[in-house]
């Protein structure tokens, strides 16, 4: 009876595309009988997939795929339908009016792209009383650091964070992700909803809501763990899409 050996490999950071490509190269050099991958960047890995096809190695995408035509299969949640359901549930919690901010894990993965696009379309088409006022992507921190630092140095934004108080000049790289998130909430005093495209983005948005003490903001997002299950039970999160 033949035995199947499964090797698990992955980048230390889920959005580290270069690391994932390097790991993929290493695994292909071992000529596995098959390859399963959750693709961090929908536009990456095509060269590696071509090499796999040339070597007769079938590739199956899990959770987050790509438009590469040579994939044998993609196994994932219906990201479009589930994001639309999340939008409808959040709109219901918001009583069909108010402002929303999207927190997304990245700009590159297919799952994040589809979830964000479907959520936006559902809100725009079917919930006209709701406006999406911002979208924060966790792989775009540096751009936001530039924006926040520029406003602070111009005197148009004064954070409550004591660590930043009294500084004449703030460098972008000095700002933490939490401070950037606090800026987003401060800039949107009429915010009524937060949508998170995965558990990391969801937790980031929820933490911002709680630091700002904005109990009027409804929170809906993807994935569940012990912490999010507790938050749902306590009413700190209003809805979870569980895969």
Region annotations inferred by a language model:
Residues 1-243:
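A residue-level marker of the well-folded mature domains of exported/periplasmic proteins
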